[in-house]
Amino acid sequence: MEQKAQETILLIEKKMSQAQEVMLKNFLEIRTGYANPNILNKVNINYYGSQTPLKTLSSISVSEGTQLQIKPYEKTLIPSIKKAILASDLGITPETDGVLLRLNFPKPTEERRKVLVKEVDKLSEQTKVAVRNIRRDANDKIKKLALTKDLEALYLEKIQILTDKNMKMIEKEANNKNKELLKF
């Protein structure tokens, strides 16, 4: 029975870590005013009838900190890439010179930054809820095992320590992202 409890601890560590990774991935896609190639992760191009990620069809680089340059491996893709970027919810109009596409990222207005801060807070709160749900499920599993009261209390305490550690990490990452957004 104790082995099952230890397996439960390892499993929740993994699940909580995965929840944080998802949050951090989502944070990368939030526009801060600095050019970040990760913002294009959700942009797909219609390439020979199938939706293909932009990053597999072109090289993407940062120029001057506030500009992304997209160089397609095939020049014939430029109109399709431009169309896909315009159709996305990025709110940026690409400029092209026939070889490259350029995306200029203006600094967000104060109003837009406040909206982005709320989005960061929403994502961090969703992650906290996920971590709490993981904790609840783990506590239920531990309580169903036929452990002594002392062992049960020990494992429940370990679960709470892991939860607290993850909550602090979520708060720290959300605060860092908010500081980055409000830096301008």
From Swiss-Prot:
Pfam families in alphabetical order: RRF (PF01765)
General function of this protein: Responsible for the release of ribosomes from messenger RNA at the termination of protein biosynthesis. May increase the efficiency of translation by recycling ribosomes from one round of translation to another.
The family this protein is said to belong to: Belongs to the RRF family.
Major location (coarse): cytoplasm
GO biological process: translational termination
InterPro entries linked to this entry: Ribosome_recyc_fac, Ribosome_recyc_fac_dom, RRF_sf
Single GO MF annotation: ribosomal large subunit binding
GO cellular component: cytoplasm
Subcellular location: Cytoplasm
Keyword terms, alphabetized: Cytoplasm, Protein biosynthesis
Name of the protein this chain belongs to: Ribosome-recycling factor
